[in-house]
Amino acid sequence: MILRTERLLIRPFKENDINDLYDIYSDTKVCKYLLHDVWNEDNKLKEFQQKLKYNKLEEGKINLACVLDKKVIGDISICYTEMKETVEIGYTFNSRYSGKGYAYESVKTVVKYLFKNYGIHRIIANLDSRNLSSAKLCERIGMRKEAHFIKDYWNKGEWTDSYIYGMLASDL
C-alpha cells in the first residue's frame, strides 16, 4: 500500500526509517498514552523490527510510515480484528509536527482507501480517554464515539479508561 496526499507519502516502513521512528517513540510526551514504554537504545532495534515485519494488510496487519520531505513523521498501524471486514487503526506522530494537519491528512486518506479498496465494512480506534488530541482526530475524520470503558486497561502502573471510536463505509 503506497498512498500520496498533497503533502505526504504513506508507505510501508523501510530499513532506513529507524532513526526517524526512534525520534517519535523516544519522546515521553508521544508515548504517554500508548500501551508501551518509550523506546531506548537497548530496545529500538527490536521494536523497529516489529514495524518492518508487518508490511502487507493481506497478511493481517500493516504498519505505514507517513513521510514529509523524506522524513518519517508518523506511524499508522492497521490490523484486522476477529470481526468480519473490520480493522482497527492506530496512529502516532512526531510531536514536533503537531498542529499542522498531517495526522488528519494521512489518517483520513488511509481510512478512505481502506473502505474503497479493501472492502472494509467497519474501522475502529481504541484509545486512552485522556488522549484528547486522538479523540478529536477520530471525530474530525468522521468517526463517532461508541463506547467509554472505565478503568479497563492497566497501563504504566495505573488503570485507565478507554474510548472506542468507529465508522462504517456508509459514513463516508
Listing of model-derived features with the role each one plays in the protein:
Residues 99-116, 132-140:
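Conserved acetyl-CoA-binding loop-helix of GNAT-fold acetyltransferases
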